[in-house]
């Protein structure tokens, strides 16, 4: 199954609450923090919502 490496590259300060909440629910707390998540439609939707704040890489496992 594919995995996604998600890195927070821009601060969510100054953005709407729902975007801040999405970043938090992805597990990203501080700038340049990274999480690895399964490549599922729910996570893709969350990434799409905050695509201007994160960097995404696909990794094989």
From Swiss-Prot:
Gene3D superfamilies: Ribosomal protein L30, ferredoxin-like fold domain (3.30.1390.20)
Stored InterPro entries: Ribo_uL30_ferredoxin-like_sf, Ribosomal_uL30_bac-type, Ribosomal_uL30_CS, Ribosomal_uL30_ferredoxin-like
A single Gene Ontology CC term: cytosolic large ribosomal subunit
Keyword terms, alphabetized: Ribonucleoprotein, Ribosomal protein
GO molecular function, one term: structural constituent of ribosome
Short name of any one Pfam family annotated for the protein: Ribosomal_L30
GO biological process: translation
HAMAP family membership: Ribosomal_uL30_B
NCBIfam families per the UniProt record, alphabetical: rpmD_bact
Family: Belongs to the universal ribosomal protein uL30 family.
Subunit structure: Part of the 50S ribosomal subunit.
Annotated protein name in UniProt: Large ribosomal subunit protein uL30
Annotated source species: Thermosipho africanus (strain TCF52B)
Organism lineage: Bacteria, Thermotogati, Thermotogota, Thermotogae, Thermotogales
């Amino acid at each position: 199954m594919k995995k996604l490496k998600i890195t927070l590259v821009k601060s969510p300060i100054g953005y709407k609450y729902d975007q801040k909440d999405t970043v938090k629910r992805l597990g990203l707390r501080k700038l340049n923090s990274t999480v690895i998540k399964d490549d599922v439609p729910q996570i893709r939707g969350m990434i799409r919502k905050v695509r201007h704040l994160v960097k995404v890489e696909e990794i094989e496992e």
